[in-house]
Amino acid sequence: MSRIGKSPIPIPDKVSVSLDGLAVTVKGPKGELKRTLPDGVTVNQVDNTIVVAPTSEKRQSRERHGLCRTLVANMIEGVSKGYSKKLEIVGVGSRAQVKGKTLVVSAGYSHPVEMLAPEGITFAVENNTNVTVSGTDKELVGNEAAKIRAIRPPEPYKGKGIKYAGERILRKAGKSGKK
């Protein structure tokens, strides 16, 4: 049995959870999330907690046990607190700005790269070089942050590019010429 899956998930005061078989709907102050969990687990609400249990001792059920518990816990935390990822743009002339729901990134290409925010995601820019991606769905926030980073990943020689806040870039020495 999964050590992560065994622990029950407490439901905060302002969050309501409704279960319909494997379909889980979580409503909170930040929004609403719906997800259908894979087969192999059962989800029950006991008092003010959610309990996820495997349906059998098959390998697939045991594998999905901890996954499903974490997915539901992330949904509850997302609608109550929300998630955010911060990115930094490093390099001369590289900057970002928000126009409505669109993030416009100038990252050294001949044209600015535009990214439309999906539903439930917001972009914020500070000082033209710090981008914050925030929303209620942890998976969607992480995917959008990864897409922004993929526009211009940091290079190892000068460290220019788009990186996560706090990310260490492994630097390389340039080539040393013949002497």
Swiss-Prot record:
One of the record's GO molecular function terms: rRNA binding
Q: Which GO terms describe its biological process?
A: cytoplasmic translation
Recorded hits in SUPFAM superfamilies, A to Z, give:
Ribosomal protein L6
What is any Pfam family matched here? Ribosomal_L6
Alphabetical UniProt keywords: Ribonucleoprotein, Ribosomal protein, RNA-binding, rRNA-binding
Indicate whether Ribosomal protein appears among the record's keywords: yes
Q: Give GO cellular component annotations, separated by semicolons.
A: cytosolic large ribosomal subunit
Listed under subunit, the entry gives: Part of the 50S ribosomal subunit.
Biological role: This protein binds to the 23S rRNA, and is important in its secondary structure. It is located near the subunit interface in the base of the L7/L12 stalk, and near the tRNA binding site of the peptidyltransferase center.
What is the similarity comment for this entry? Belongs to the universal ribosomal protein uL6 family.
Name-wise, this protein is Large ribosomal subunit protein uL6
Q: Which organism is it from?
A: Synechococcus sp. (strain WH7803)
